[in-house]
């Protein structure tokens, strides 16, 4: 449970849920200080028995930053004292997933609730890091890289499925002709209309390049996840690029496809009713617009310091040009 109501698209940058260590009882006190700090968009919020909650930790009056706590949400099917949840309401898509808000009212957690692989509070109330030179939230944020690759793949999979279903419809849809062809040939099909035929071909070419790039990012990230290492700057940039590029490419192609198939796009079985899924992808694991601004800022900062921006001339930069390159997508950088 990371996202908070007030944070909006700055999820992860804004976290006001509080966890204070009570040395007298050797417990953490988890609290939502105001409504804007309530956890929001929490999947399985109505069914989960346990949750990993991100909260700003204070030990001995000193703030030590965001940390993760494993806690019981429910015991015996009932919410634990101090925890309240609510329905976020009907969404435009994904209503099979129960997204809830969660509020904590001075919920007490044992000292063992702190996920302490990288930092801990001992029985005397002393805070100490266990992993040198890496803030605990950086290790938590490591999972964002996995999420960005997964979001990119999800957007590409949705696009592929929508195009597959729509192509099958278009190939079976006759286009009325003013007169029969002298040869007796069957009526032309919707898929043969030039603009639709061109869009199908364009989509295959563009998607193949983006999919190749995302796949390379996954291949480079996987061994780092196994060892717990953080990606280098070039791979971080490439993964962010992959997420933005995959989602924006899918949005562009799917929206254009919708314009070409008329009232078919209004049918519930067509798949177009779930186009807002791509909006979910746009905002998940880092809003694409903010993520793009961050990438630009980081590269300008490197340039201002006289350093070659991450990736040089660069694999990540190349991903932004993959639609104009005749060869396959640029390889994802190694560490």
Language-model segment annotations:
Residues 12-15, 48-50, 64, 97-99:
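Short beta-strand-initiation
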């Amino acid at each position: 449970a990371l996202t908070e109501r007030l944070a909006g698209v700055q999820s992860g940058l804004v976290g006001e849920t509080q966890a204070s260590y009570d040395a007298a009882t050797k417990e953490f006190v988890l609290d939502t200080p105001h409504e804007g700090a309530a956890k929001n968009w929490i999947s399985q919020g109505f069914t989960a028995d346990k949750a990993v909650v991100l909260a700003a930790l204070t030990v001995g009056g000193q703030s030590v930053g965001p940390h993760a706590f494993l806690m019981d949400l429910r015991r015996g099917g009932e919410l634990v004292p101090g925890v309240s949840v609510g329905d976020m309401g009907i969404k435009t898509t994904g209503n099979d997933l129960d997204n809830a808000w969660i509020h904590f009212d001075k919920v007490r957690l044992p000292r063992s609730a702190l996920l302490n692989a990288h930092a801990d509070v001992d029985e005397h109330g002393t805070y100490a890091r266990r992993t040198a030179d890496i803030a605990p939230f950086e290790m938590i944020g490591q999972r964002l890289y996995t999420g960005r690759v997964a979001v990119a793949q999800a957007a590409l999979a949705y696009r592929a499925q929508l195009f597959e279903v729509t192509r099958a419809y278009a190939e079976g849809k006759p286009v009325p002709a003013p007169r029969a062809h002298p040869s007796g040939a069957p009526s032309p099909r919707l898929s043969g209309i030039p603009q639709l035929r061109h869009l199908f071909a364009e989509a295959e070419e563009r998607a193949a390049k983006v999919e190749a790039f995302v796949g390379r990012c996954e291949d480079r990230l996987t061994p780092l996840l196994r060892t717990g290492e953080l990606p280098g700057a070039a791979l971080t940039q490439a993964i962010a690029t992959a997420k933005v590029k995959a989602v924006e490419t899918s949005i562009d192609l799917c929206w254009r496809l919708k314009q070409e198939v008329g009232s078919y796009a209004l049918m519930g079985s067509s798949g177009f009713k779930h186009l807002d899924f791509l909006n979910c992808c746009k905002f998940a694991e880092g809003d694409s617009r903010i993520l793009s601004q961050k990438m630009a800022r980081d590269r300008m900062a490197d340039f201002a310091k006289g350093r070659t921006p991450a990736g040089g001339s660069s694999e990540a930069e190349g991903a932004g040009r993959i639609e104009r390159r005749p060869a396959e997508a640029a390889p994802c950088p190694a560490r």
